[in-house]
Amino acid sequence: MTVGILGLGLIGGSMARAYAIAGHNVLACEKDEQMLQFAMLAGAVHGKLNKETISVCDLILLAIYPGGSADWLEENACFVRKDALVIDLCGVKREICRRCFPLAESYGFTFVGGHPMAGSQFSGFKYSRAELFRGQPMVLVPPRFDDIALLDRCKQALEPCGFGRFSVTTAEAHDQMIAFTSQMPHILSNAFIKSPTASNHKGFSAGSYKDLTRVAWLNPRMWAELFLENKDYTVSELDIYIENLRAYRDALARDDLQTLTTLLEEGKRRKEEVDG
């Protein structure tokens, strides 16, 4: 199989390594020429993905920012083979699916939204690894839910990555859930570390501090674009969180032991309910 990959950051680079190790021919498009050459020297990429080589790809993976992925596909759709499968790997789904589903239908190829639920606080090809997706969930957003053959095709095409579980959903449901499970933790972590007290944490911090601040180290431009594309759901989740924080803050300010205990009990019970 020949696989074309747009973008060689953490996700695209890890995909390239996984497919190369599995013996597939990997072509890549990367604006940073030095990074592309490094990926070739590392054996993760075997050639360039461009207008001349798009047509040889059986599978194309879009691994750059959402707007850029859709722009690239709109510009190059005429070169995509009709029997090719195109999967985007962006963190939000509504806008890219809105643009790319009709595009694929018009040109005769197949487009599926995808979101690998794996990553790192680090970005870039140098942090990529073939095992990044091993055992991790993969979310698929197909054009139709009743196309079992397409879902099987996606699973087979993504087999070299070693995903442990596949979930199928709509673009709307995906973005609503991702606002809570992914975007909110990144915002909270990034805001938390801005406390002036953080400068003196060494010697006073352990697991809880590390857990909460790990994803504060993020790619600012990428995450800003993701947040803005999903601002309705993310703002809604932020409003809920701010309201909850206010309740804790007010109970503390009033020295209200009973209310504070109740709030903590509610949070503990909710954790047990959602995670068992």
Where are each of the predicted segments found?
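NAD(P)+-binding Rossmann beta1-loop-alpha1 motif at the extreme N-terminus of oxidoreductases
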Residues: 1-51, 55
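Internal alpha-helical scaffold of NAD(P)-dependent oxidoreductase catalytic cores
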Residues: 130-214
